[in-house]
């Protein structure tokens, strides 16, 4: 572990990490302090230059024409639905196996979530989507669970057939791809979270919406800042969901210096686990597909004695959740 520890770490000293087992995601904090100090000295706290740079960096990372920074991943979902005029009387197809924010955003927008079951890889079963479509359906919201992309070719094809929007909950998949293409190419928008739990994390909350559609991006830039076109003119009613400049500085540092290594290590760790666990007949892992680049925000296994194994792992200082 010593290669992953910050320079401030002393032997036998416990480094408290609430949200991640990867110490590297929370290392280099003395260097990040310097980036934050630059922001403080400029007093540029709201939609500052670091935010502009962060949006450019994130757009490049995700292959998108436009990246709109927002306050958190939940707002990213909600604001996208609002910008697409999805609300009361509308239905949005998604999955029940997800964090509450996915469904919460749909309900808060005034729409009704319609659930489609997941497959063995924990992602939406694309072959069951069409049966869930009604006259009220306005969008499909696939959730790329645990860092594994959904089968977007089929989902996007269905969406185009029925003229539906596609809003991808991409909170777990920064750096992932589908058939060597960026996920933003399969729908209206992808939404991301930079919560401390995520592969790309800031020191608090942060989120992003990426899209290739200029009209959608322009509306989102307005909605995330009260609908203000400038200081005195409001074009639409919006929200206060700006990514603050300090968090943008943290994100910029991590995109430049940390994210690639974090992704590589997660893939390497998962590959090792796949290899070692394949010899254990009591453990079932997710089948890997060549056309999917996974980034392993989580690593899933299935066992019969789930609770017993969880207790054993935790007792041996290996975090495990159900």
PLM region descriptions:
Residues 68, 93, 114, 166-167, ...:
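Structural detector of well-ordered beta-strand residues that form the stable sheet scaffold
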Residues 14-17, 204, 294-298:
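Short, solvent-exposed beta-strand edge segments and adjacent coil->beta transition regions
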Residues 1-83, 87, 108, 160, ...:
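Conserved PLP-binding active-site segment in aminotransferase class I/II-type PLP enzymes
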Residues 168-203, 230-235:
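Conserved active-site segment immediately N-terminal to the catalytic lysine
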Residues 3-4, 22-23, 51-56, 64-67, ...:
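PLP-dependent aminotransferase class I/II
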Residues 69, 94, 115, 209, ...:
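Conserved SAM-binding loop
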Residues 192-193, 207-212, 252:
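Short beta-strand-to-turn element immediately C-terminal to the catalytic PLP-Schiff-base lysine
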